[in-house]
Amino acid sequence: MSINQQAYNAIKAIVGDRFISDDPAVMEGYRSGPAGYENGTGYERVMTVLPHAVCLPKDTEEISKVVKICARYDVPYVPYSTGFYGPRTHCHVENELIIDLKRTNQFEYDEKHFFFDVGSGVTLAACQQEAMNKGAYSVIGGGGAQCSAICNLIGDGWSPLSHRIGLPHRRILGTELVLPEGDVVKMGSLAVMDDPFWGEGPGPDLRGMLRGFTGLRGCLGIVSKMAIKTLPFQPEKLVPTGVAPNTALALPPRVRWFNFLMPNKPAQVEAMYQIGHAEIAAALTKVPKFWRAIAKAEDKEEFWKLWLVENEESLRDFFIVRVMLVGYTSQEDFDYQEKVLNDIMTELGGKPTRTKPSDESWIKNADSAGMWLMCGSYVSVDYIIESLTQATQHGDTYAELKKKYTPPLMPDFGDPGWFQGFEMGHQGYSEFLIYWDHREDVDGVDQFYVDTSKMNIKHRYYTSLLGPHQPLFLTGPMYGPNYHTWLLKVKEEFDPNWISHPPVPLAHDDFVNRAPWMQEMKDWETPEKLPMRQW
C-alpha cells in the first residue's frame, strides 16, 4: 500500500474496517475493462491504473470526512458508483483512492410531488420501477438501468423518452455536493430548508458546476445525494415477459410503439418536426438498421450473418421513424394521438410496418448493457444537442470521416448513426457510435476520436463532448471562445491541489502527449507543460 498510513487509518475510523481495503485482489475488481463502454482503447492502456485502496462511505457526512482527510494528507481520489463509463471513471494516477459510492443507497419517493430523493449508489432500475409502481416514470439513458441515477443526471442521461420528458439538467432538484476539499454545498431548496423539492430559478445557477450537456467526471467534487423530478405515467402495469436474455415488457393498451417507413430523409426529419409541433407522443427516434440486426440476432455470430448481407445502398434507402404513444389520461387521449400521428404520416408518405407489442430497450433499458458489444468494444464517439436541422446533418459527416478508419472500426456501410427530437422538437439530437475488436491494433480508434473534434471545428458543429472528453487545448480556443480558460480557472479555485480525479479535465491532453501514435494528430497549440499538478 502506498497511500499514507495515517490517512488510511483515519478513513478506516470513519467507514469501519469492513468498508476499506488495500487488498490487491480487491483492487483488481476495479480494473478498467476488459469490455464495455470505451474499454479496449489506447486511452485505457495509457491512462488507467489500479487503485491503491478503496473505501465505501455511506452518506454525505462520511464522504465529506473522507474527502477532508484526502485533502489533509494529499491523497488523490476518484468518485465511483457503477463504473459504466469505462476508463474515464477509473484511477489515472498512482497511489490513488477510489471512493466507491455503492453504500449511499438512501431512497425516498415523494408520491404527491413526483420526485425521488436518492444517494449515488441507487440505480436507475430501482428508480424507474418505484416510479412506475406509483403511476410515474422517468428516463433511463442509453447506458442502461444498471447505472447510477445521479450519474445520469450529472452526465448525459437521455433517450427517445426525452422527446417529452425534459433533459436531465432540468430535472435536478435539491442536491448535496461535496467539494474537492470536503465542504458540502447544498443546492436548490436544500440551501434554506430540509425539503429538496425545488432545483433553482431561471438563469445561471450552481447546477452548472455539475454538468453541461455532458459532465466533468468527478473533477469538481462528489454529488452525494439528489432529488430527481419524475412525471405522471398511465396507470396500467407493464408486465415483464420472456426468459433472460430474451426479455421484454408487455405493453398495455394505452402504451404502444409504432414504426413508419418514410420515403426519404427529409420526410423522416419533417415527421419529427410535426410530431413535436402537435405535442403528441412519449418517445420518438430514428431507427438505424444496425439496431434491427442486433434485435433479431441471438448471438454475435448470427448478428454478423445478418449484418454482412447489407451494403451502402440498402442502408441509404432505410428511413424508419419509431414513435411511442402513451394515453396518459385516458384511452381517448391515446386514440387522439394515434389519429394525429396517422394524419402526419399519411401526408408525408410514411408507411406503417410491423413492430412488437412490447418494449426491450427504452422504458427499462434491460438490454443496453450488452446490446452494443457485437465487436467487444464500443463508444459514443460524439453527440450533439442542437436544432433538428443540424443534428440530422451531423451523422453524414461522421460516416464519411469514419471510412478512413475502417478497419479497425467495424464496417457499417456508411450508416450515419442515430438522431431524434428532444423536448417536442425544440432540440435535435445526433449520436454516432463506433465499434471495434479490442484484440486488434486499435491506434486508429484513438486517432478517429480526436479527428472528429477537428471535423466538428471545421464544419462548425456544436459538440456535447467537450471538457474532459477531448483535448481541452484543441476544443477550448474554438468554442466559447476559450471556454478552457474558464474551466481551468474554476478547477483551480475549487481544487487547487488537483486531488479530485486528476488529471481531469486535462486527461485527454495528457493522453495525446504520452501516446506515440497520437503525435501525428497533434497540430494545435498547447502549452509545453500542461497547467496541472504532476503526481
Model-inferred region functions:
Residues 14-42:
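Conserved oxyanion/phosphate-binding beta-strand-loop segments in alpha/beta enzyme cores
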Residues 58, 259-267, 322-331, 383-390, ...:
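Short beta-strand-to-loop capping motifs
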Residues 44-52, 65-68, 74-76, 80-96, ...:
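Conserved glycine-rich FAD pyrophosphate-binding loop
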Residues 37-137, 148-160:
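Long, structured ligand/cofactor-binding scaffold of large enzymes
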Residues 106-110, 120, 124-264, 532-535:
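FAD-binding subdomain of flavoenzyme oxidoreductases
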Residues 19-24, 56-57, 77-81, 99-101, ...:
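General beta-strand structural signal in soluble alpha/beta enzymes
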Residues 202-205, 211, 227, 238-247, ...:
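C-terminal cap/substrate-recognition region of VAO/PCMH-type FAD-linked oxidoreductases
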